[in-house]
Each structure stands twice: as C-alpha cells, then as structure tokens.
Amino acid sequence: MSAIAPITGSLKKRIMKDIAVGMGLGTVLGSYWWWGFHKPKIAARENYYTQLAEQKAAEE
C-alpha cells in the first residue's frame, strides 16, 4: 500500500469541467450577443424600413 493515494478520475473530471465551462460561457456570450447586439440592430433596421414605407405611402 502506498503512502499517497493514486489520483483517479482526474481526466474525466477535467473533461467534464471543460465541457461544462465551455457550454456555460458559450450560452452566456451567445445570449449577450443576441439580446445586446443583434436584437437592437434588427429593431433599428425594422424601424427604418417602417418609416420609409410610411413616407412612401404618404407621398402617394
């Protein structure tokens, strides 16, 4: 019997931790991009084209 117990399962724990951290960060950053950048840009574009259509309808 050795004085120090062997380290078992460390690779599996490391892989699971890496996957969990990667999925968590990916979800958080993806959500930030979607709600913080993409949605406001799309809303601004939609507002622009709505105003443009209203102006065109008013001219006719």
Curated annotation (Swiss-Prot):
Where does the record say this protein resides?
Answer: Mitochondrion inner membrane
Native organism: Eremothecium gossypii (strain ATCC 10895 / CBS 109.51 / FGSC 9923 / NRRL Y-1056)
Upper taxonomic classification of the species?
Eukaryota, Fungi, Dikarya, Ascomycota, Saccharomycotina
Q: Which family does it belong to?
A: Belongs to the fungal cytochrome c oxidase subunit 7a family.
For the Mitochondrial matrix compartment, the record's topological domain ranges are 1-18
Question: Keyword set for this entry?
Answer: Membrane, Mitochondrion, Mitochondrion inner membrane, Oxidoreductase, Transmembrane, Transmembrane helix
Which function does this protein serve?
Component of the cytochrome c oxidase, the last enzyme in the mitochondrial electron transport chain which drives oxidative phosphorylation. The respiratory chain contains 3 multisubunit complexes succinate dehydrogenase (complex II, CII), ubiquinol-cytochrome c oxidoreductase (cytochrome b-c1 complex, complex III, CIII) and cytochrome c oxidase (complex IV, CIV), that cooperate to transfer electrons derived from NADH and succinate to molecular oxygen, creating an electrochemical gradient over the inner membrane that drives transmembrane transport and the ATP synthase.
UniProt GO cellular component terms: mitochondrial inner membrane
The biological pathway it contributes to is: Energy metabolism; oxidative phosphorylation
Q: Which residues cross the membrane?
A: 19-37
| Subunit structure and binding partners | Component of the cytochrome c oxidase (complex IV, CIV), a multisubunit enzyme composed of a catalytic core of 3 subunits and several supernumerary subunits. The complex exists as a monomer or a dimer and forms supercomplexes (SCs) in the inner mitochondrial membrane with ubiquinol-cytochrome c oxidoreductase (cytochrome b-c1 complex, complex III, CIII).
Report the membrane topology from the UniProt record.
Single-pass membrane protein
Thylakoid among keywords: no
Q: What is this protein called?
A: Cytochrome c oxidase subunit 9, mitochondrial
Q: Which residues form the propeptide?
A: 58-60
The biological process GO terms on file are: mitochondrial electron transport, cytochrome c to oxygen; proton transmembrane transport
Gene Ontology MF terms:
oxidoreductase activity
User: Which InterPro entries does its entry note?
Assistant: Cyt_c_oxidase_su7a_fun
Mitochondrial intermembrane-side positions: 38-57
Primary residence: mitochondrion
